Amino acid sequence: MAITAAQVKELRDRTGAGMMDCKNALTETDGDIELAIDNMRKSGAAKAAKKAGNIAADGTILIKNGEGFAALLEVNCQTDFVAKDSNFLAFANAVLDVAAASKVSIEDLKAQFEETRVALVTKIGENINVRRVEYIDGANLASYRHGDRIGVVVAGEADEETLKHIAMHVAASKPDFVNPEDVPAELVEREQALQIEIAMNEGKPAEIAEKMVVGRMKKFTGEISLTGQAFIMEPKKTVGEVLKSKGATVTSFIRLEVGEGIEKKAEDFAAEVAAQIAATKKA
């Protein structure tokens, strides 16, 4: 049976697949579009399963406000080229819309968009992963995105400009906690034990070592907490001092960065080029 251009166009419109893929699928089914779609979906699932082992450490961070909260979403792909692809971004934004509508869990988001994800993996040719979603509550929220790779939302009692500046600070300085006193006791105890050992190894008398450790611990908890850090816009003041001068407070924040915690495969380009040259010589 001859496959017409109209049939190929219809299949492309319905699946988003390439022209030759559509033509081949229709040829295999003697022009049966519905069967071709079924076969392409099966083939897509198989391809997606093969791609699942590929490391997806690139991607985008998106932010959207809901009713009294904000949603932050990370969707991953394998390359920065695909991270800018309109189809990839449309998929990520569709997931975000659902998340921001009713605080949908990451498990439910993945399940709801799995079929769409598989189709996109087939079309683009890279592993794609809806990795994580975070929600932050607050009547006063300010967000900041640094490019497509870092997203921050801050909640607190302050004017919008102040919270925006704090969000920018969080993006740059990566605090782990809001206040020094929020640092967990076990983390403080572990660091304190380490600092005592370091001071003793330096041969300091016990009294001096103790005072040194007190100072070092204050510095430690300050450096990993938002209000204890030097404010990037006024380095001579801490964030806490800036907030106090404005009668403002920060209650919570969330910071997401693309690929955090994902172990990326190290690429040795020199070795890759050498291997290509060797292969050429053999040929």
Curated annotation (Swiss-Prot):
Keyword Nucleus: no
Pfam families per UniProt: EF_TS
Keyword Protein biosynthesis attributed: yes
GO molecular function: translation elongation factor activity
Compartments, record wording: Cytoplasm
Cellular component GO terms held in the UniProt record: cytoplasm
Transmembrane feature ranges: none
Involved in Mg(2+) ion dislocation from EF-Tu, as annotated region: 79-82
InterPro entries, sorted: EF-Ts_dimer_sf (IPR036402), Transl_elong_EFTs/EF1B (IPR001816), Transl_elong_EFTs/EF1B_dimer (IPR014039), Transl_elong_Ts_CS (IPR018101), UBA-like_sf (IPR009060)
Keywords: Cytoplasm, Elongation factor, Protein biosynthesis
Role played: Associates with the EF-Tu.GDP complex and induces the exchange of GDP to GTP. It remains bound to the aminoacyl-tRNA.EF-Tu.GTP complex up to the GTP hydrolysis stage on the ribosome.
Family that this chain belongs to: Belongs to the EF-Ts family.
PANTHER family to which the protein is assigned, alphabetical: ELONGATION FACTOR TS, ELONGATION FACTOR TS, MITOCHONDRIAL
NCBIfam families (alphabetical): tsf
Protein name: Elongation factor Ts
Species of provenance: Shewanella frigidimarina (strain NCIMB 400)
